[in-house]
Each structure stands twice: as structure tokens, then as C-alpha cells.
Amino acid sequence: MQKPVCLVVAMTPKRGIGINNGLPWPHLTTDFKHFSRVTKTTPEEASRLNGWLPRKFAKTGDSGLPSPSVGKRFNAVVMGRKTWESMPRKFRPLVDRLNIVVSSSLKEEDIAAEKPQAEGQQRVRVCASLPAALSLLEEEYKDSVDQIFVVGGAGLYEAALSLGVASHLYITRVAREFPCDVFFPAFPGDDILSNKSTAAQAAAPAESVFVPFCPELGREKDNEATYRPIFISKTFSDNGVPYDFVVLEKRRKTDDAATAEPSNAMSSLTSTRETTPVHGLQAPSSAAAIAPVLAWMDEEDRKKREQKELIRAVPHVHFRGHEEFQYLDLIADIINNGRTMDDRTGVGVISKFGCTMRYSLDQAFPLLTTKRVFWKGVLEELLWFIRGDTNANHLSEKGVKIWDKNVTREFLDSRNLPHREVGDIGPGYGFQWRHFGAAYKDMHTDYTGQGVDQLKNVIQMLRTNPTDRRMLMTAWNPAALDEMALPPCHLLCQFYVNDQKELSCIMYQRSCDVGLGVPFNIASYSLLTLMVAHVCNLKPKEFIHFMGNTHVYTNHVEALKEQLRREPRPFPIVNILNKERIKEIDDFTAEDFEVVGYVPHGRIQMEMAV
């Protein structure tokens, strides 16, 4: 039975993979480590690595794996001539792997003459086509090669897909677009990259690698096949480029998405040679396919991952390293296990009490991707809070109408505030941040110098005594609650600086609208942490979200079920511009921020409960 082929590739949302025979993006350190480990690691070696899953991947470029020598099993990497020649001479051949170059012009003796063959390294082979390379592997390396990885270029990728031999795709999703002149071919399932793939198809290279079908392998193009993700990592970033890693598995379009239970897949990780058939191929199981990646990434809580639920977010993704899965799994948990109750709005909720999420800020920014988050609204509202502004009309005039329904004449009257003008939220949020305890008159009054400026005090403590355990800011003022249009939902935050001068923020939220509000709140306090870190000369580290009454409105359930079917994409990066000008928290403007690499799924309509 023919060995399957796995494709390893890094690409932009529009499937760009190269330009001028090189990479379009700057050096991505973790991607290089990922490529090395995936293509070097055999199933046996992965199973021996610290009982499968080390807590941290190695800090150096060394894989820590034994070099395959003659008599030991190893993996093969197959590449086109241009890919081979694009690698610096000192890095070729790729060590600890059998290298096969597909070319009609190169000769094995020419490659061998480049430099002496290292001890234990297999000699580089040259074949005229991908089918010829696969035949060579089957005939001469049947008992020594474990897995076959095609690593470029575009023509070989297209040949593997057309031949129907590609069982798994190892994709690095580069979230930013770069100018490209070479593109990965379109494939069923490429919406994992973006909402609509629009890249023009690059012509296949002149080398004879593209074959629409291959009678000698008995394989024809399978129009009923698609690729779906079984692994999504957390987001990494290097040189201002956010990216993550996904593994896609070949499936028939008619297959039930929940056929492969996560518990079965994870239990098979302890098997060293387990394989399952994929369309007539001897393909690795889902677990075996992701084993090389699992071998260097942090382990998620296995019991949580294996738990069977009535509703589950993208259940075919077995390894859920992307931090957005916290949010998606929270939605599913509430719908499955929450209590249905009445609420103030009259809509009704399904709720749980006491939930937590953690989001890293040192690599990327947690702007959720399974639906588009209103970034302008997040930014403008936070700046509004920081100014201590209580006039919601100022937001509405900028197109941010998130407060409009809570400051109408009817709503203010229902709060026993008939004396308030439309748009006046009262002494809430930003007023308490900057003027805690001051007597509130109306949204037009200048409160400079009145009350306690909590935000200023926190920043001063971070600058002068960063180990202080009293760096808190609260919007909850019991004496003023009846004067507010809405009592604050997110009401307390605390800051912490570690010994590496990294800043983290904890926020406690008493009332959490998971469908509409929580994605906004995650982004808002993450952004606040970035801003405070900048003016205090610290590095952002983590945002921790503590949630009290955590609920899904009953009229959001169907929309959220749609969201649970969407795979997360890489988180973006948020850059602060004009850094030299910004010395104090009040110096920030909306023009000082740049979001890089945000490629979310489309919007999902949900009505706000008032």
C-alpha cells in the first residue's frame, strides 16, 4: 500500500508562499523550529519525548532527537529544484532526513559534489517527477522511511493534491499579507485561511511535476475529498508577524464531522505505529499526524479536551492550543451545563457562576477571530473611559453606538434618572477611574482635580514600586450606583509586574454577556494593559479574565452555535505608533494604534438585551 504524503507549507491568508525564489516575510524563528521538528520526528521518537508532551519546546534549534543512521527509521523530505536551490548551501541537505529533489536537470553526482556527505546522513536522491519519487521511496526505502513530507514548491504541492496522495497538510498560517509571486494551489478546506481565497494561481514550474492523475499509482483526483483541521496552535509572533500552526486531515465531504472522537484520537497517541486508512492510503491516524507538533508544544488539559458534550466547538480539532478555544469552549459549556433563568432584561439567560480565561499578550493580541470584533468600538470606548468622559453622545458621533440604547430618555427614566440628559451615563466607569468619590452633577461639568484619580495612582505605583500589591482600580462605587445609567459590569482590575518587567492584568466582571460583551471586554482590558505597559516602560505579558455571572442570552444561542462551527485563526498584533510622543496615558489617540494580521470570520448578528 502506497505511503501517504504530508505537505508542509507556510502561507498568507491569500495562499502566498514565495517571492523571487525566497520567503515573502521576515525570519519566523518558531516556524523554523516547527518545520524542523515536524519533518524530523518519527512516531517512535515523538512517543519517547518526555512521555509524549514536554511542557516547553526546546529553546535552541537542536531538535534533541537522535540522528537517523542507516538501519534506523527516518522521514523523507521531497522538494523541487528551486526549493533546493533557495536554501543556503550550509543548510542543505536537511539533516536527519532523506532528501529527495524533484528535477529533470539536476543530477545526484552534482549534488554530492557540493560538500562531503555527513556521517549517518542519507545521500540526496534526484527524481524526475513526484510519482517517480514516491515509487523510489516504496521500492528502496519501504522499511526505513516512516513519513514523507513535501516541502515545496507550488508545482509539487499541486501534484501531491492532484494525485490524491496528500493525507495531511501542516500549515503555518501567516496572518499578514505580503507581496508574493508564488501561491499554494486552492484546495477544499482553504477557508481555514480566510473568508474567501482570492489569490491568483501561479503557473506550475517548468519541471514535470504536475500530473492530473497517475495510473501507475492507481490514484485519481478525488473530488469528494476535503481537508479539515484537527490541530490549531496558539498564536506566535516574530518581527511583527503573527502566525500559528494548523494540521489539516483529508476527509470525505460526506464524513460526519464528529466521527473521530477526541478521546480515541488522544488515546492512540501512545501507539507507536498506529495507522488508519484514508481513501485507500496507509495514512497516519489523526493522533499520529499531530504527534510531531504535540512533541514540542504545551499540553492542554487532556481531560477537558476529551470531555464529551452535547455541543462542542469544532469537535474535529483534537489539539486546541489556540487561546480562543477558551472562549468557544465556555460558550459550549454554558449552553450544555448552564441553568436557564429569567433576568433583568426579560429575555432570559443560560448562566454559570465563576469562570476564568487567560490570554497571552507577549506574542499576539486576543482580538477574537471566529467573528469580527468591532475594533473601532473597543478603542474609542477605552479612550473615552481614560478621559473620564460620561457623555455617550461623543461615542455615537464617531459611529460607536454601543451605549445608545442605555442612554435613551426611556431607559434613563426607567432608572429613575429623569433629570439626566439623553446620552449622560452618570458617574460610571471612566468617571470612577479618574474621579472616584467626587460629587457628580452632569456630563458637561469639568471635574479636574476632584476625587481620586485611580488610574494615575496605579501608573505612579507601577513606575516607582512595581512590586506593590495594591495596584487596583475599581469602577464599583456603592454610593453612586443609583446615579449611573448602568452599574458597571467590569468593575475591578489589578496589575502585576514580574521579575522580567512584564505587566499582567486581572479583571473581575460581575455580569458577563458571553455572546456580545465578553469579546469586547477581552480586547478592551488587553489594550489597556498594552497602553499602561508602554507608559511605564514595561512589556505586556497576560490578561486574566475572572467572570462572575457568566451567561448566554437565549436569543443568542443559535447565533453562537454558528460561531462554534468556526475554526479560530491567528490572533493579530496591535502596534503602538508614535511611541516617542506618548509619555502619559492621556497622550494616546485613536491614530496611535495599528492592527496587523487580523483575518477574522464574518460578523454574526446578535441583538443586545436592554
Swiss-Prot record:
Q: Where is the composition biased (Polar residues)?
A: 261-275
One of its Pfam families is DHFR_1
Residue stretches making up the DHFR domain? 4-250
Q: Which UniProt keywords apply?
A: Methyltransferase, Multifunctional enzyme, NADP, Nucleotide biosynthesis, One-carbon metabolism, Oxidoreductase, Transferase
Q: Where is this region: Thymidylate synthase?
A: 322-610
- Catalytic activity annotated for this protein? (6S)-5,6,7,8-tetrahydrofolate + NADP(+) = 7,8-dihydrofolate + NADPH + H(+); dUMP + (6R)-5,10-methylene-5,6,7,8-tetrahydrofolate = 7,8-dihydrofolate + dTMP
Report the record's Gene Ontology biological process terms: dTMP biosynthetic process; methylation; one-carbon metabolic process; tetrahydrofolate biosynthetic process
List the pathway annotation: Cofactor biosynthesis; tetrahydrofolate biosynthesis; 5,6,7,8-tetrahydrofolate from 7,8-dihydrofolate: step 1/1
Q: What is its EC number?
A: 1.5.1.3, 2.1.1.45
Q: Which residues bind dUMP?
A: 344, 490, 509-513, 521, 551-553
Amino acids binding substrate: 8, 31, 157, 172
Region annotation Disordered: residue ranges?
Answer: 256-282
Question: Per UniProt, what is one GO molecular function of this protein?
Answer: dihydrofolate reductase activity
User: According to the lineage, what is the superkingdom?
Assistant: Eukaryota
SUPFAM superfamilies reported in the protein's UniProt record:
Dihydrofolate reductase-like, Thymidylate synthase/dCMP hydroxymethylase
Q: What are the positions of the active site?
A: 489
Q: Which CDD domains match?
A: DHFR (cd00209), TS_Pyrimidine_HMase (cd00351)
| List of residues binding NADP(+) | 10, 16-22, 81-83, 102-105, 152-159
Task: Spell out the GO cellular component terms annotated for this protein, sorted alphabetically and separated by semicolons.
Answer: cytosol; mitochondrion
Q: Which family does it belong to?
A: In the N-terminal section; belongs to the dihydrofolate reductase family. In the C-terminal section; belongs to the thymidylate synthase family.
HAMAP family from the UniProt entry? Thymidy_synth_bact
Q: What does this protein do?
A: Bifunctional enzyme. Involved in de novo dTMP biosynthesis. Key enzyme in folate metabolism. Catalyzes an essential reaction for de novo glycine and purine synthesis, DNA precursor synthesis, and for the conversion of dUMP to dTMP.
Q: What is the name of this protein? A: Bifunctional dihydrofolate reductase-thymidylate synthase
- This protein's species is Toxoplasma gondii
